[in-house]
Amino acid sequence: MLNASYLLAIICRRFWRYVWKIRCVFPSKSLTTFFLNDGSRFDYPLKTAIGCSLFRGEFESHEIAFLQETLKPGSIFLDIGANGGFYTVIAAKQVGVTGHVYAFEPGHSELEILRHNIAINHLTNVTIVECAIGNKTGKAQLAISSDGAMNSLAKTNHPQQCIEYWQSVEIIKLDDFIQKSGIKKVDFIKIDVEGAEKFVFEGFKNILLSDNEIKIMFEASDLNASAFGYSVKEFLENILSSGMKLYYFDKTSTLVEIRDYDPKFGKKIYNFVASKDELI
């Protein structure tokens, strides 16, 4: 006889499989409204991986809790790969009118959603920067996917990256942007750029030298990194060798320190946090 927890797991799997199927009746660009735990409103297409995760109430809740715990009124937050602005909206509310959020997004469709979400939340402390971030300043080609969260500066091995066309975009090193903008201090950087994370790091060496309390949250997997010619192992070991502390969110979403590379990190997408000081 099936025990209750096993039966519940089966029911849940079948329910969400059904939800995943019926999402296809929604027009791909129509927006669904989600209300976040801080009272903010976030509109996003349901027919996407992020949209379905939001519908299930499962989208990076522990990462958001860490962000909200870390950011203070007056903090400066950089959202690199802002997409529709999920992190931007939450961070803007957290840092308040004395803080500021810089949201970097090169994709045209994503920029429309980002502007929309900033407007409906009446946010006045956000600057949108229409460009990609990397280890050079100039021009680049962005692969536009049917699911905007899969947009990337390369054709990756991610099965959900369905490229519709390529878009020419501006790209800039973060150090160059900081210098041009006159930003004195950066408190938190979130990076989600579908494989180009290592190149983003290479472009803000001056920030790492000057800001001792900076926190950097980023994702990485070999599925995406391999398209850019590097491995997650190489990337994480470079961070550790620089003297920074490195952490990841485990299966229970607890923040765990990384002292040595574990092969599991390359096999699936993990969210990591790099910091100069101890977090746990």
What are the roles of these predicted feature ranges?
Residues 1-280:
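Phosphate/nucleotide-binding beta-alpha loop and adjacent structural elements of enzyme active sites
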